[in-house]
Amino acid sequence: VSARCILNGKLAVYPDDAVLLPGSSIKLDNTFLLRAQSRLYWNEHRFLAVDPRLDTAALAAKGCSFSAPKAILCASLAPVLAPLFPDSTELIIVPDGTAVVEDDLELTASALRRYGSRLYVLGDVTIPAESADLLARVESLHVTGEVQLPEELEDAFYAIPDLECGKVVHEAPLPPEMPSLDDEEPDPDTVTLSGFQLTL
């Protein structure tokens, strides 16, 4: 007996008896630890473990294991957590204090106040011209997507000590503004009446 199957979408293959965790990222923190069991946890995308406060010894003692295409681990947690993933998982080790931003990011003063100076961005980054002084404050920047910035900021951008990104795109210059008709000096010999000009 033969059968045909048409799949409209994508197919995800996961290990037998795994606990399927939905979402684009799963954070391993002390809240996760409260409910953790001696099970294999699987996610289609990635696990994040960047909070140094996570009690990794307690997590490992519960018999947890994890499986996903990628895992982002801060350096201090990696020695204990890395063995809990299979060899097929790509392990990305980041410095302690790194904030993982799960969206596009515009580098502004408020963004640095919120996330700090060590950033791992799962998306694109835009650096406006007015943020030139902020680049010197960035210690680590990893961007999975593109970076858009003015050409004059390129040297300061590449001076970031720990830098990794995709394509760098320069902002297109704005087209010169055309003078408005209202801004033109009126001709003293011309009178405008309801849209019609009469030359005297």
Language-model-detected regions and their locations in the chain:
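Intrinsically disordered, low-complexity regulatory/activation regions of eukaryotic proteins
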Residues: 73, 90, 180-182
